[in-house]
Design a protein with these regions (language model features):
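Cysteine-nucleophile active-site neighborhood
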Residues: 100, 105-174
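Short, glycine/acidic-enriched capping/hinge loops at junctions between secondary-structure elements
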Residues: 50-53, 79-82, 115-116
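N-terminal beta-loop-helix "entrance" segment that forms/cooperates
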Residues: 73-86
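Amide-donor transfer/coupling interface in amidating biosynthetic enzymes
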Residues: 1-74, 89, 93-95, 99, ...
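Helical hinge/lid and interdomain linker segments adjacent to catalytic or ligand-binding clefts
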Residues: 85, 89-93, 108, 115
Length: 305
């Protein structure tokens, strides 16, 4: 799939090494097609890494996709150069004037804070409400999934006694859904979080469907509004070495750090990770783009409501 990205975005050179077809804006303007328009609200600290992870997964269909990145007014990132944010990110005020075929809201390392104590909570609520009338389908990932479930449906999050950290086997509960097209009877998903949502809370809300879960990591996927909203509690988008970097960053600094479960070869960090989720991640994002964005969005994007 030709990915339409801003000129000079750092992810471009990395993706070209993976033989992913990347099209800059100059070339894209010469093609007489309407690209799917995806906006990404990237709340992760290492923004360039997350950009690359997501863009790589959006590269698996023959559709042209235009990707834009959104920044918050109420929060200034500390781990990303100001120049990068100014060059590649646009404000919600600017992007909110347009409509979008799809949206992705990432996680953020703030899950132990009450939602109302997050400095950008009010702005996030405004963006969530806006997405319901301006986006065909939205993916909420990890913290964003918990935040969206709380904001829209009053689902609380609960602190875990120990960090959910590793790669866990998931079970599709409605396997004939288009989002699971091509999936096996089980699939793997990385998790890295200190909080969770409970099945018992979600089951009280008839608008919500739990579509995948694990006996070890709990609810992993929730769908609402016939696929216009997906809440994903894990990280299918993670690169092979992400959990390894988290473990090495925290090991020795805190007493509660444990090795990521079911991740290293022979459970030995020196042998590197055993990647068991990559194919499912590609399938999931491909199915989302095809069945819940491309096939549902109007050709006239202004008709989204």
């Amino acid at each position: 799939m030709p990915l339409r990205l801003p000129d000079k975005l750092p992810a471009i050179e990395l993706l070209k090494k993976d033989n992913i077809f990347v099209m800059n804006e100059t070339r894209a303007h010469t093609q007489m097609v309407r690209p799917l328009r995806i906006v990404v609200l990237n709340l992760m600290p290492l923004k360039i890494t997350t950009e690359t992870d997501l863009v790589r997964l959006l590269s698996n269909t023959p559709l042209q996709i235009e990707i834009n990145f959104m920044r918050l007014k109420s929060h200034t990132p500390r781990n990303t150069p100001v120049e990068h944010m100014q060059m590649f990110y646009k404000s919600f005020k600017e992007l909110s004037l347009q409509k979008w075929d799809g949206m992705i809201v990432t996680g953020a390392p703030i899950e132990l804070m009450p939602f109302e104590d997050v400095e950008y909570w009010q702005e996030i609520q405004t963006i969530f409400n806006w997405a319901r009338t301006h986006v065909t389908s939205t993916l909420y990932i990890c913290w964003a999934a918990q935040a969206g479930l709380y904001h829209f449906y009053g689902i609380p999050k609960h602190e875990l006694p120990q960090k959910m950290f590793g790669v866990f086997r998931q079970y599709p509960l409605i396997p004939d859904l288009p989002i699971f097209r091509g999936f096996d009877d089980t699939f793997m998903m990385p998790h890295s979080r200190h909080t969770e949502v409970w099945r018992s809370d979600i089951e009280k809300v008839h608008e919500l469907k739990i579509i995948a879960e694990s006996p070890d990591s709990g609810v992993s996927m929730v769908m609402a509004r016939e696929g216009r909203e997906f809440f994903i509690t894990g990280h299918l988008e993670y690169a092979p070495d992400t959990l390894d970097k988290e473990y090495k960053r925290d090991n020795g600094k805190r007493n509660d750090v444990v090795k990521p479960f079911n991740y290293y070869r022979d459970d030995d960090p020196s042998k590197g990770p055993f990647v068991s989720w990559r194919s499912y991640a590609n399938l999931f994002f491909c199915n989302w783009i095809n069945y819940y964005v491309y096939q549902e969005t109007p050709y006239n994007i202004e008709e989204i409501e």
